Every structure is written in C-alpha cells, then in structure tokens.
C-alpha cells in the first residue's frame, strides 16, 4: 500500500499523483491519496484503469470542512469497489445487517450500507454536496490559477526579507499554503507570538504549530534526534 498526501498542509507543496500512482501500480501496490489539504484548490480525478492505464487512484480521502462553507461536514472516502472484499463491516452496527436470527446473521451486500453503521450524517452530507457544488461552479482550474498567482507573489516578496524564512522549496508547485519562521537576532520568534501579531495587529488569520506533521516539521527546521529529545523532555 502506498498512501501519500496530494499536497502538504504545511508547505503546500503538491505531489505528482500521476507519476506516483503509476509507479505504485507498476509494483503491484495500491495508490491511496489524502486530499485533506488539496481538495479546496485542485481538481480531484480518480482516473481509469482502462486500456492499461496505471495512473488511476484506488482511493482518496477528503475533509470537506476545509472547503468554503464546509465546517460541520463529514469526511469523505472515495474508493474502488474491489477494495471492499471483506463481507464483515469494519464497524458492525445498525443498518449493516440484512438478516438476523437466533442462530445466524447476514451482513448487507451493498458496500454503502455495510460500511456505514447507524444513522448517517444526513444534513451534514447534504452540506458537503453543496460545498463541492460551489467549488465546481467557480471552477477548479480558475481557483488553481488564482491561488497560484497569490502564493507566487507572496513568496517572491517574503523570500527577499532577511528575517523571514519560508519553509520548503520555493520553486516546487504548491497550493496557497505557506509556512515560515521569523528571525530576531540569532533566534526565532515564538510561533504563537507571531500568530497573535498577525491576527490582532494586521487582521491576518494564521495558525502556529506543526499542523499534524511533526516528523515533516523536524526535517524542515533541521531538528536532529538529539535536539528532538531535548524538546521532548522539556514538554513532558
């Protein structure tokens, strides 16, 4: 199994899903993609395995709450039917059983029923549909082009400032997501202090921290294992 992010939620750097999926399938692996960060900005195409094409995706995971209007929506899994070969649901519960007696039971043959126990998030799912409808109405290509222009302009200015260190490659294709640290003398300003200034003084919404990507943060900041253990001891 190969499971990767379509784009980083830390640096915004985009992965070549076509090349990676092709390589995975050449070696008999499944191609699974996390679109949590990328979904609001880029087209999502599962592709087809017809005519020997190997660039298709076996599954994608999406967090619609990151799209415009998306807070409160459920997560979405889109996967090829052949992956659901287990006749027993991952979480048995209401709606997953088609027939039951005192001696035996049968689970539902339809994947959607078998793998979603209990009452589904009906209103929230309708909302998820609406946010994707909005994205399609604007046009993923339009969004992608406009966001790319924004982030290129920002990086071009920020990378010239001696006290701003934009993390990750400045040349790679990326979403309009940028992580940076601010130097003051021979040290960096605390991230939450920078966030407070951006929000309270300049009205710029931002987030401090490693965004659920601790190991990647170690690499970007050049934190070796010894320094990591020092941080761990202080935190704990």
Language-model segment annotations:
Residues 1-236:
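Pyridoxal 5′-phosphate
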